[in-house]
């Protein structure tokens, strides 16, 4: 069974729903966690109390995506420690 036959047998509504789920899943697991990581790296030492509290809430909300990228991103200051 080819992919064209498979896609033609599925209704357009079903394909739209699947596409919506894939888009939301990608937004939740990839796009927002990366944006949040870069935002934290950029603003970490100048954040106010309310901004830091809201960032902690977003980290909690996007935790599944954050844990995927955590081993690859480093938020430490450059120039710290001996090389």
Swiss-Prot record:
Q: Where in the cell is it found?
A: Cellular thylakoid membrane
Tree of life domain:
Bacteria
Check the record and name the Pfam families matching this protein: NdhL (PF10716)
Q: Where are the transmembrane segments?
A: 18-38, 53-73
Keyword Thylakoid applies = yes
Question: Which UniProt keywords are present, listed alphabetically?
Answer: Membrane, NAD, NADP, Plastoquinone, Quinone, Thylakoid, Translocase, Transmembrane, Transmembrane helix, Transport
Its membrane topology: Multi-pass membrane protein
- Molecular function in Gene Ontology: oxidoreductase activity, acting on NAD(P)H, quinone or similar compound as acceptor; quinone binding
Q: What is its EC number?
A: 7.1.1.-
Where mainly found?
membrane
Q: Which InterPro entries match?
A: NADH-quinone_OxRdatse_su_L (IPR019654)
HAMAP family, A to Z: NDH1_NDH1L (MF_01355)
Concerning its family, UniProt says: Belongs to the complex I NdhL subunit family.
Q: How does it assemble?
A: NDH-1 can be composed of about 15 different subunits; different subcomplexes with different compositions have been identified which probably have different functions.
Q: Which purpose does this protein serve, as stated in its record? A: NDH-1 shuttles electrons from an unknown electron donor, via FMN and iron-sulfur (Fe-S) centers, to quinones in the respiratory and/or the photosynthetic chain. The immediate electron acceptor for the enzyme in this species is believed to be plastoquinone. Couples the redox reaction to proton translocation, and thus conserves the redox energy in a proton gradient. Cyanobacterial NDH-1 also plays a role in inorganic carbon-concentration.
Q: What is this protein called?
A: NAD(P)H-quinone oxidoreductase subunit L
Q: Which organism is it from?
A: Synechococcus sp. (strain CC9311)
> Which lineage is the organism of this entry classified under, starting from the top rank?
Bacteria, Bacillati, Cyanobacteriota, Cyanophyceae, Synechococcales
Gene label: ndhL
């Amino acid at each position: 069974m080819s992919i064209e036959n498979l896609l033609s047998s599925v209704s357009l509504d079903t394909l739209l729903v699947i596409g919506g789920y894939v888009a939301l899943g990608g937004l939740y697991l990839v796009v927002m966690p990366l944006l949040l990581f870069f935002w934290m790296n950029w603003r970490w030492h100048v954040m106010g109390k309310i901004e830091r509290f809201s960032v902690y809430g977003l980290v909690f909300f996007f935790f599944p995506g954050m844990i995927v990228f955590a081993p690859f991103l480093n938020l430490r200051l450059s120039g710290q420690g001996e090389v």
